[in-house]
Structures are given as C-alpha cells and as structure tokens.
Amino acid sequence: MLLVTNDFPPRRGGIQSYLEAFVGELVRTHELTVYAPKWKGAEEYDEKAARSGYRVVRHPTTLMLPEPTVASRMKRLIGEHDIETVWFGAAAPLALLGPLARRAGARRIVASTHGHEVGWSMLPVARTALRRIGNDADVVTFVSRYTRSRFASAFGPSAALEHLPPGVDTDRFAPDPDARARMRERYGLGDRPVVVCLSRLVPRKGQDMLIRALPELRRRVPDTALAIVGGGPYLETLQRMASDLGVAEHVVFTRGIPAEELPAHHAMADVFAMPCRTRGAGLDVEGLGIVYLEASACGVPVVAGRSGGAPETVLDGKTGTVVDGTDVDAITTAVGDLLADPRRAAAMGVAGRHWALDNWQWRTRGARLAELLSGRREARQA
C-alpha cells in the first residue's frame, strides 16, 4: 500500500495528524510506504517510522504537485514495492495522478478529502479537477457531512463518497490532574480560571474573538486567563490586540509545542474554546475539528464555532456549546457560563469523555479505512 501526500509529519497540522493516526492503525496489518515532501526533522522522524514498521520516502522539495517528477517517483515506488492500492492523503490536487498510478500497476485508488476541497468546489477550473478525481477513484472519503454536502456535486454522480471522520486516542487524551498542575505551573497560571484555545494561529480559528471577549469574561469571572496554544502567522496580530485591549498580561502565548504535549495543554483548561468561523465567502471553512474531540476526551467542556463540520464534534448542551464565531457576545456568554458554573462544566467534561470513548475511537476508524483500501467490502452509501 502506498500513501501519497503533501501532509505528513514532522510538519504539523490537522491533516498531518489525521494521516499519521491512520498510518498507525494500518501498519498493524498492512505493509505501507509513505511518499511525502521533505521537512525539517524528517530524517529523525523517518527512522522512528521504520522502527514502527513502515517506510517513508521523501520528495526532494517541500511541496508535491501532480507533475512529472512526482509522477515518475510514484510510479517507480509502485513497481518497486508491488503496490496494489494507492491512497492519496488529500484528494486535491495529488489524486489527479490516479490514472497514472493505475497504469503503473495499482489496482485500487482511494482519495481522502478534508476541508480545502470545499473551496476547490466553488471554483470552475478546480471543480473540473475534482470531477476527474471522482470519476477515477474507487473511493473518495470525507471527514464530515458538512463537507460532503458542499462538494459532492463537484466530484460527480459516479463518485463513491464514504464517511471517514478522524478518531481520538483516548488513552493519550485523557483527564490528567498531574499534567494540569504541571502546565499551570509552567505558565504561572496557578488556580486561575483558564480558557485554552489550541490551534494553528490563523484568523478562521477565532483566537481574536476570545481576546475580544476576555475583558468582559474577567469582569464576570475575576482572574480569568486565556492560553493561546500553537504557532502561526496570526501571532503578532493577536499579541497587538491583547495589548490594545489591556489584557496582555492575562493572555499566555505558548507558540508551537511538541505533539507529545498536546494532551497536557488540554488538561490545564477549565474550558476549551475555538470559536471558528467561515471566511473568504465560504472558501475558508472548518472541515471538522478533531481538536474539540481531543479536549472532550481530556474531560474538558468545549465551545465550538458554527463553521463547517465543527458542530458535528459537539453534543450541543451536553458536551459543550456551539456558537456563532462572529458574535463576541455569544462567545462571551458561552465561555462565561461554563467558567461561572464549575459543576455544570465538570458534568459536560464527563459527558465529553464518554462521547469520545463511545463514538470516536481510532481503532474503529482504522478498521473502516482498511476495508475501503482493500475493497473487501462494498462501499456503503453515506
């Protein structure tokens, strides 16, 4: 089996985490090769991958496109390793190489979608590319029912669309009082009420709205602090905003953190909030939002934005609250209600843990992907 993708560690992001977790499940039962771009730290990562039972082949640049050099290397890998199935980790654009993969000997083509294909589906030339992918692939997977509703017509009536949302490692993401104390000590938060937003720092994620909400949150729940976890191009803008609003000393910017510290940073939260919003006339949208489920698995109540598939990760009113990510008053109310009522927040956290355990296990998701990759079972209508 060959995974061809632009999105793979050690580069970090939502798609990278999604694919890495599925690879971890697949290697239990499959021989797997990953073809991905080079990235800082790749040599060390690839050595660990080899010890875990799969090989990673790196393209010499940091971006792979459906062009001759990538096509040639892919075809060579198919021949060298007797590849029967090629899985394109993100359908757009690399799954345009599907016909070449078949001619090189692959018998089955699977292409996974995320959130950016929604934007592609709104552009005429890109829609044509998606139609070609839908016509050629044996299966096209989607992470949320929202994304399916937005791009299904672009992939065309012959596309076999299958629901393949991510899972959560509920052993790794779990309530952890020791980690909570350790992280709070690291950032000097003590016993303060803490709101955590863990995400790449880009406008869609809504960190700016949490900073705007913080003055009123602090009036309602004294001593509240906001921890913005992650790195990204929006950092300096957010820092200026916190300073302009007079709350800079109450906002912690951790910048990027190691992947192994993600659960510990969730653990320090009283509330997890990422009030995402759709931007760019619908081109920039939240495909699903696994981070909400990771917070739930850690026993933390969540506040999610009503963007794309994000509401599918929350049982509204039970594991958290879904709000309009453009409405600072709604965000303030949702977060403030949870901070002001620790008993209710704790009950939502417990419900979230059960939600993750009962419905979002990686083992179940991995078994379904293995079926789709092998073709052992007929594709089921989503």
UniProtKB/Swiss-Prot annotation:
SUPFAM superfamilies: UDP-Glycosyltransferase/glycogen phosphorylase. The lineage of its organism: Bacteria, Bacillati, Actinomycetota, Actinomycetes, Mycobacteriales. GDP-alpha-D-mannose binds at residues 200, 205, 257, 294. Gene3D superfamilies: Glycogen Phosphorylase B. The keyword Lipid biosynthesis applies. InterPro entries: Glyco_trans_1 (IPR001296), Glyco_trans_4-like_N (IPR028098), Glycosyltransferase_grp1 (IPR050194). Pathway: Phospholipid metabolism; phosphatidylinositol metabolism. GO terms for cellular component: membrane. GO terms for molecular function: glycolipid 1,6-alpha-mannosyltransferase activity; phosphatidylinositol alpha-mannosyltransferase activity. It is an enzyme of class 2 (transferase). GO terms for biological process: glycolipid biosynthetic process; phosphatidylinositol metabolic process; phospholipid biosynthetic process. Belongs to the glycosyltransferase group 1 family. Glycosyltransferase 4 subfamily. It comes from the Bacteria. Involved in the biosynthesis of phosphatidyl-myo-inositol mannosides (PIM) which are early precursors in the biosynthesis of lipomannans (LM) and lipoarabinomannans (LAM). Catalyzes the addition of a mannosyl residue from GDP-D-mannose (GDP-Man) to the position 6 of a phosphatidyl-myo-inositol bearing an alpha-1,2-linked mannose residue (PIM1) to generate phosphatidyl-myo-inositol bearing alpha-1,2- and alpha-1,6-linked mannose residues (Ac1PIM2). This is GDP-mannose-dependent alpha-(1-6)-phosphatidylinositol monomannoside mannosyltransferase. It comes from Mycolicibacterium smegmatis (strain ATCC 700084 / mc(2)155). It catalyses: a 1,2-diacyl-sn-glycero-3-phospho-[alpha-D-mannopyranosyl-(1<->6)-D-myo-inositol] + GDP-alpha-D-mannose = a 2,6-O-bis(alpha-D-mannopyranosyl)-1-phosphatidyl-1D-myo-inositol + GDP + H(+); a 1,2-diacyl-sn-glycero-3-phospho-[alpha-D-6-acyl-mannopyranosyl-(1<->6)-D-myo-inositol] + GDP-alpha-D-mannose = a 2-O-(alpha-D-mannosyl)-6-O-(6-O-acyl-alpha-D-mannosyl)-1-phosphatidyl-1D-myo-inositol + GDP + H(+). Keywords: Glycosyltransferase, Lipid biosynthesis, Lipid metabolism, Phospholipid biosynthesis, Phospholipid metabolism, Transferase, Virulence.
